[in-house]
């Protein structure tokens, strides 16, 4: 009697029912693939600065064409916070295009970001550990009070002690909540200031490469991006997180009211609406950028064809000069675009790591509260962890939106090529 071979398509569930995708949830694979694809897209841009031969060749092109970085680029670097400028390599101020290119090449090395990540994580990890230790101490006291109040047998006294315990924990972390909201507000202010300074820089480089229509379109769309970042993120995230924190406190003090579902609904609607708006804006920018770049390229090629037809010798010389200039402009675009991405990451990393570690401290505190039998305090800490998850998603989505916009600026070819 022959045995049937196992196909390995799925796992058994119940009475022979098969679970597809090896027993795992397929959307999780899709999200992991999307994150990996975005990472590879960014690394493909950064890898352009890893080879010294390419840098030296483009340096010769810049010298031959007489090109330099726009003066607005230096103003963008000077407008960065002091703690960010201290992290920049020497020559990144934009005064010399060759030195700036070498500085961007230095920033594209993995060792640079590894050192920066270790430094920032070390600072923020100490704050998170102190917060977790403070929460554990308060939860231990709450557990002792819970044991004491159970011996009295009075429901009113038990509720009063539980109310005081939850209020004490909330009062202890209130200044941390205020500090994080202030840091998020400052991050959006700096991010918007950075991108506001990058708009004239990108517009100048677009015009230098012959992409006049693309310069006008890209600048207007980036202004819309800044409006969305200011109105939906900078001004709205703090009131939303304040409402979620208030609902979390009320839900932990009076669980019978049932405000947890309302807080979850507000958080999901806000993040979904923000993600939808940013997706539409990126789709609009990419489509308009492609169409305008194609129109500019067609116009430039037509002009070169006419000049080479009417005056063959002079036209051929002009075409060769234009190709040299276009190569230099494309290199300057890469330097400016990738340095802008690095500036965004330098602004993002401290805020993002601080939010993630603080959220982790609250979630671990919620687990400790459940172990010690502090149900109300555990609910409060768990809800606060969700609030920090909302802040983290808003900060990350806004940064990714501007990073993809700059990546599109780098990858679009100049019209003179």
Residue ranges and their predicted role:
Residues 2-9, 29-33, 41-162, 176-191, ...:
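Gly/Ser-rich, low-complexity
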Residues 18-19, 26-27, 33:
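Short, low-complexity intrinsically disordered segments enriched in A/P/G/S/L with frequent Arg
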Residues 150-155, 254-270, 370-378:
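Membrane interface segments of multi-pass transport proteins and intramembrane proteases
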Residues 164-176, 195-212, 232-244:
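Mid-bilayer segments of alpha-helical transmembrane spans in multi-pass integral membrane proteins
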Residues 218, 222-339, 343, 347:
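Generic multipass alpha-helical transmembrane bundles of integral membrane proteins
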Residues 334-375, 383:
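Helical hairpin unit composed of two closely spaced alpha helices linked by a short loop
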Residues 354-362, 366-370, 374, 389, ...:
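Membrane-helix cytosolic exit motif
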């Amino acid at each position: 009697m022959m045995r049937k071979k196992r196909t390995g398509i799925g796992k058994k569930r119940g009475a022979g029912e098969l679970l597809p995708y090896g027993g795992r949830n397929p959307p999780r694979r899709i999200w992991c693939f999307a994150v990996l694809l975005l990472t590879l897209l960014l690394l493909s841009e950064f890898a352009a600065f890893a080879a010294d031969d390419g840098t030296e060749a483009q340096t010769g092109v810049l010298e031959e064409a007489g090109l330099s970085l726009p003066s607005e680029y230096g103003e963008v670097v000077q407008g960065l916070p002091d703690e960010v400028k201290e992290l920049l390599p020497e020559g990144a101020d934009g005064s010399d295009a060759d030195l700036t290119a070498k500085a961007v090449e230095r920033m594209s090395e993995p060792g640079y970001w590894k050192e920066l990540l270790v430094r920032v994580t070390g600072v923020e990890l100490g704050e998170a550990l102190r917060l977790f230790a403070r929460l554990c101490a308060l939860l231990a006291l709450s557990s002792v009070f819970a044991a004491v109040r159970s011996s009295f047998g009075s429901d009113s006294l038990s509720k009063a002690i539980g109310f005081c315990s939850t209020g004490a924990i909330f009062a202890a972390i209130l200044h941390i909540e205020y500090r994080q909201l202030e840091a998020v507000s400052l991050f959006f202010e700096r991010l918007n200031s950075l991108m506001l300074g990058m708009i004239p820089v990108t517009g100048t480089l677009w015009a230098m490469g012959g992409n006049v229509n693309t310069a006008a379109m890209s600048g207007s769309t980036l202004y819309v991006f800044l409006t969305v970042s200011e109105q939906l993120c900078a001004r709205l995230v703090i009131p939303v997180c304040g409402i979620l924190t208030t609902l979390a406190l009320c839900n932990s003090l009076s669980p019978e009211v049932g405000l947890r579902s309302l807080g979850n609904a507000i958080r999901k609607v806000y993040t979904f609406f923000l993600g939808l708006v940013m997706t539409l804006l990126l789709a609009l920018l990419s489509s308009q950028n492609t169409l305008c770049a194609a129109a500019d390229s067609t116009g430039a090629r037509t002009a070169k064809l006419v000049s080479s037809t009417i005056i063959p010798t002079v036209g051929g010389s002009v075409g060769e000069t234009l190709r040299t200039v276009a190569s230099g402009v494309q290199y300057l675009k890469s330097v400016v675009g990738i340095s802008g991405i690095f500036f965004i990451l330098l602004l993002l990393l401290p805020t993002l790591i601080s939010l993630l570690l603080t959220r982790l401290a609250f979630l671990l505190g919620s687990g400790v509260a459940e172990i010690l039998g502090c149900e109300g305090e555990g609910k409060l800490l768990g809800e606060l962890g969700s609030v920090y998850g909302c802040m983290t998603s808003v900060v990350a989505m806004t940064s990714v939106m501007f990073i993809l916009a700059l990546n599109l600026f780098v990858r679009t070819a100049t019209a003179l090529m």
